[in-house]
């Protein structure tokens, strides 16, 4: 980046370089050799209690640990230096605990299905599978260079048939289950059918089960399933040819992938009933060792609120409204429905009432025309856009509803700030006490009634507490009492009930694409879905020559999805015997969303070779089962440490928790949560540069001169942000490994700052980590001769003993707490001490090599071997601190004169007040400030300070 050459180690030794110096070339040779040794010896392979990975005698260590990374999507660009941050951190953690004797499971797979691979394939004409497999090979090569201690037998890709067989199997378990609200858990659908057949459970309409036709029974059962089809409002993206989950749509109503317009459209789609688990998903956040930020994000996403359901009567039937403020019902002066509400068509009148306010008509000649025009005007808006603070818009339906509190007729509008996905898709508008309603009322000339005293509703809505007014029998009550009283009255009148509502919506679980897991579902000639038997799995994704999605004009909101699998006609139409003879069925041509594989992959790491089950119960219980003795009586179980980016706080983590809880309810796993502990790593950021047009230029070719930055002779402008291909500031880990070695990259990334914090990348600073490793090397190896320079029987002086054991204690604590940056700092300090004092004693240097091993494993293994050991240090032992050397002999005290620190003194740790006072008065700096004066008072605070008052 600068015109001044950056210091880099020579890849090959020149004439002036000692023959046995730790150079980039030597580092590369050492790293390659040890990676091969680890692979051949299976150094990081860990045993399972049962199955193919079990030892012959079936015994496994009781002290296990399961460490997991959020697995990568194998993109075509490969890794940049920001990607390995979390992988290296977990490797350091796993290596440390492995050296302390723990049986550590650490493996890494690939999340390879989904839109990115398909989009790239469409652009290049390469089949998604071909490109994905090539990308995985490159990722494995790049990750392999880093020396990550993974059990490679447990690696997989979500696109492997052996993996997605079990994704389909889990789908069938969820499909063939229902949520028993009385038991607050999922149960097999067969048990529900048994209850209907026995009469234990009856139909809501009172019909006997025996009188229902087969089709009617199927409809009832399907309405209970945890997976169901529904006509629902979805996010349709014509430019991608698929529907998207809410989480895949940006705030400005465009697709996160490709930046295409997204439209709200009603389609029949597969849904997963995640809302049934809302309370449990909330409650179990309390027992998880997760960042508070992530817990808050999940709580907000689930969005639990308590209130009342209120029925407003209309000519088209009752409109159900959910409100958290039933106490304000007397102040409801109009209703607003989401434009997509199913009653809109029935309510919209043929003509406007006499003397209708022109502001209410949306410029249309009839209410029905107003509805059509208004819907068209908001079709491309995202939910967030619809709720932004702006001028309120809407249209009157030409219809009225009856307020159940006072019997008054109130007009009914549609408006975009009411969403069909929350509550009932209808609100009672109380403009006196809700600011959005107040703004809408002022825009449309609607009445504003005060029902809570304490504010000036002529200026703005009053949302505070107060006593009820203008509310009949509620007058004089406080808000809490009024809520209870009005809810009781609504229940008594049959016009409402107490209710809990959630923002969380059921999970849209289908995509109209090619590159995803096929559904194990077929349809009969009547269009009724049937789950395939488990024996029919896997349903393999067919190889088709035309896998591109059916795309539309990005602005064509009226287009309809046409999944690419429809083109595979030989695959789509299949003859099966599902219990009633051989019949022709049609396969479901949607595929699962990209979140499917990542919603359960932690379980497959525990038993990746099992062909008979998702994972053996013994293996899941060993690696993920609850451990009340270690983690407390309410331990939910799960992976011991999960590390990944905070961007997955809601989607992936919420979906995986949902799937795991269903599997727990059905008895397939012993843990009720997938991840016991979560840590979000920060990001590695870097400078990027733009020219006068705002276009990014290659950061590696920018030079700095006189405080300005130049590219090809023209001035460019520096900015700071993420590393990436689009910003042209990407740095490949291959480049750093080539120029310094993988161990240097590991040490540099770990020493840049706390794991959770983002940090700036600076290639010019990498050399500092390399020089540290060179100093460690020189403590063991003579650079001139290559001989080991360690003395076997040299005794350690007291200072070195203290430095050693304090380093061991501090580094152990730091590794366990993922404070790798401070661990590195302590190791550098100890290395400097040994170098400065010329220590060559084996007793001082071998512990250093062991402590360095989690950070720089290749170097440590090589030094360990040169020190005469014939086994790997990967399994320890990690040094243990001797407590006698951790005692502090001296203490430093600040000395204040009239409250300001003027000096510092060092005294024995057990020094008394008299000694402290004498030492403070004898200090030269203090004497200078006293200038011969005698202090009026000396205040000694043991362990903290000395203050002289003059």
Swiss-Prot record:
GO terms for biological process: leucyl-tRNA aminoacylation. It comes from Mycobacterium sp. (strain KMS). CDD domains: Anticodon_Ia_Leu_BEm (cd07958). Belongs to the class-I aminoacyl-tRNA synthetase family. Signal peptide: none annotated. InterPro entries: aa-tRNA-synth_I_CS (IPR001412), Leu-tRNA-ligase (IPR002302), Leu_tRNA-synth_edit (IPR025709), M/V/L/I-tRNA-synth_anticd-bd (IPR013155), Methionyl/Leucyl_tRNA_Synth (IPR015413), Rossmann-like_a/b/a_fold (IPR014729), tRNAsynth_Ia_anticodon-bd (IPR009080), Val/Leu/Ile-tRNA-synth_edit (IPR009008). Keywords: Aminoacyl-tRNA synthetase, ATP-binding, Cytoplasm, Ligase, Nucleotide-binding, Protein biosynthesis. It catalyses: tRNA(Leu) + L-leucine + ATP = L-leucyl-tRNA(Leu) + AMP + diphosphate. It is found in: Cytoplasm. A motif ('HIGH' region) lies at residues 72-83. GO terms for cellular component: cytosol. A motif ('KMSKS' region) lies at residues 722-726. One of its GO terms (molecular function) is aminoacyl-tRNA deacylase activity. Gene3D superfamilies: HUPs (3.40.50.620), Isoleucyl-tRNA Synthetase, Domain 1 (1.10.730.10), Valyl/Leucyl/Isoleucyl-tRNA synthetase, editing domain (3.90.740.10). This is Leucine--tRNA ligase. ATP binds at residue 725. SUPFAM superfamilies: Anticodon-binding domain of a subclass of class I aminoacyl-tRNA synthetases, Nucleotidylyl transferase, ValRS/IleRS/LeuRS editing domain. The keyword Ligase applies. It holds the Pfam family Anticodon_1. Its EC number is 6.1.1.4. It comes from the Bacteria.
């Amino acid at each position: 980046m600068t015109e001044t050459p950056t210091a880099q180690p020579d890849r090959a030794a020149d004439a002036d370089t000692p023959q046995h110096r730790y150079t980039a070339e030597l580092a590369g040779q050492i790293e390659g050799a040890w990676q091969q040794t680890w692979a051949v010896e299976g150094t990081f392979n860990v045993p399972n209690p049962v199955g193919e990975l079990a030892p012959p005698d079936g015994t496994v260590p009781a002290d296990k640990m399961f460490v997991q990374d959020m697995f990568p999507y194998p993109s075509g660009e490969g890794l940049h230096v920001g990607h390995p941050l979390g992988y290296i951190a977990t490797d350091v953690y796993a290596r440390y605990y492995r050296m302390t004797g723990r049986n550590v499971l650490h493996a890494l797979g690939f999340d390879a299905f989904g839109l990115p691979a398909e989009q790239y394939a469409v652009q290049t004409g390469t089949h998604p599978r071909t490109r994905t497999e090539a990308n995985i090979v490159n990722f494995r090569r790049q990750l392999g260079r880093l020396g990550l201690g993974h059990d490679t037998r447990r690696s997989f890709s979500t696109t492997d048939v052996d993996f997605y067989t079990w994704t389909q199997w889990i789908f069938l378990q969820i499909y063939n289950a229902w949520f028993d609200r009385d038991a607050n858990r999922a149960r097999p659908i067969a048990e529900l059918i048994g209850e209907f057949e026995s009469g234990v459970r009856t139909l809501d309409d009172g019909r006997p089960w025996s009188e229902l036709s087969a089709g009617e029974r199927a409809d009832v059962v399907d309405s209970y399933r945890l997976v169901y089809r529904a006509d629902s409002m979805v996010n349709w993206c014509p430019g991608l040819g698929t529907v998207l989950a809410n989480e895949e749509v940006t705030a400005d109503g465009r697709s996160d992938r490709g930046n295409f317009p997204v439209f709200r459209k009603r389609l029949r789609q597969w849904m997963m009933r995640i809302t049934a688990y809302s309370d449990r998903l909330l409650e179990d956040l309390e027992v998880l060792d997760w960042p508070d930020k992530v817990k808050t994000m999940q709580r907000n996403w689930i969005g639990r609120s308590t209130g009342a359901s209120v029925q407003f009567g209309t000519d088209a039937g009752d409109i159900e409204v959910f409100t958290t403020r039933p106490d304000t019902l007397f102040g409801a002066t109009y209703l607003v429905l989401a434009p997509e509400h199913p009653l809109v068509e029935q309510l919209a009148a043929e003509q406007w009432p006499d003397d209708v306010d022109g502001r209410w008509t949306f410029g249309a000649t009839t209410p029905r025309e107003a509805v059509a025009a208004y819907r068209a005007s908001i079709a491309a808006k995202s939910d967030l856009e619809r709720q932004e603070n702006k001028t309120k818009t809407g249209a009157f339906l030409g219809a009225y509803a009856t307020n159940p509190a006072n019997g008054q007729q109130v007009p009914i509008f549609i408006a975009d700030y009411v969403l069909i996905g929350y509550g009932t898709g209808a609100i009672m508008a109380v403009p006196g006490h809700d600011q959005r309603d107040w703004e809408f009322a002022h825009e449309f000339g609607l009445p504003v009634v005060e029902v809570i005293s304490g504010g000036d509703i002529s200026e703005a809505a009053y949302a505070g507490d107060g006593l009820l007014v203008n509310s009949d029998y509620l007058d004089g009550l406080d808000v809490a009492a009024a809520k209870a009283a009005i809810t009781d009255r609504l229940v008594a009148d049959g016009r409402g009930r107490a209710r809990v509502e959630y923002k969380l919506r059921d999970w849209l679980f289908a995509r109209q694409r090619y590159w995803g897991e096929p559904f194990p579902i077929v349809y009969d000639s009547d269009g009724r879905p049937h789950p395939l038997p488990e024996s029919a799995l896997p349903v393999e994704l067919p190889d088709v020559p035309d896998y591109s999605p059916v795309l539309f004009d990005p602005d064509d909101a009226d287009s309809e999805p046409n999944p690419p699998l429809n083109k595979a006609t030989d695959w789509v139409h299949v003859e099966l015997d599902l219990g009633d003879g051989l019949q022709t069925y049609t396969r479901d041509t949607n595929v699962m969303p990209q979140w499917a594989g990542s919603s359960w992959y932690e379980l497959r790491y525990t038993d990746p070779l099992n062909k008979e089950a998702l994972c053996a119960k013994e293996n899941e219980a060993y690696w993920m089962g609850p451990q009340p003795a270690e983690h407390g009586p309410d331990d939910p179980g799960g992976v011991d440490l999960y590390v990944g980016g905070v961007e997955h706080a809601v989607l992936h983590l919420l979906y995986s928790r949902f799937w795991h809880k269903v599997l727990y309810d059905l008895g397939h796993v012993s843990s009720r949560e997938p991840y016991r502990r979560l840590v979000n790593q920060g990001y590695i950021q870097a400078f990027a540069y733009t020219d006068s047009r705002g276009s990014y230029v290659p950061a590696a070719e920018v030079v700095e001169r006189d405080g300005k930055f130049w590219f090809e002779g023209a001035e460019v402008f520096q900015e700071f942000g993420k590393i990436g291909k689009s910003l042209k500031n990407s740095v490949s880990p291959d480049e750093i490994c080539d120029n310094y070695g993988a161990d240097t990259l590991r040490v540099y990334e770990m020493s840049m700052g706390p794991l959770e914090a983002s940090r700036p990348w600076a290639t010019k600073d990498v050399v500092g980590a390399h020089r540290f490793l060179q100093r460690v090397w020189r403590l063991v190896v003579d650079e001139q001769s290559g001989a080991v320079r360690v003395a076997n029987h040299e005794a350690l002086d007291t200072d070195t003993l203290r430095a050693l054991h304090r380093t061991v204690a501090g580094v152990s604590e730091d590794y366990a707490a993922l404070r790798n940056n401070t661990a590195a700092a302590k190791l550098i300090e100890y290395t400097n001490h040994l170098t400065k004092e010329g220590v060559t004693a084996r007793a001082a240097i071998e512990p250093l090599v062991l402590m360095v091993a989690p950070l720089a494993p290749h170097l440590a293994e090589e030094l360990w071997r040169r020190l005469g050991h014939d086994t790997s240090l990967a399994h320890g032992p990690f040094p243990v601190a001797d407590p006698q050397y951790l005692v502090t002999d001296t203490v430093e005290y600040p000395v204040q004169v009239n409250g300001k620190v003027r000096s510092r003194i060092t005294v024995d740790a057990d020094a008394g007040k008299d000694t402290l006072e004498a030492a403070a008065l004898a200090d030269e700096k203090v004497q200078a400030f006293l200038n011969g004066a005698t202090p009026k008072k000396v205040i000694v605070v043991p362990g903290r300070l000395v203050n002289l008052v003059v």
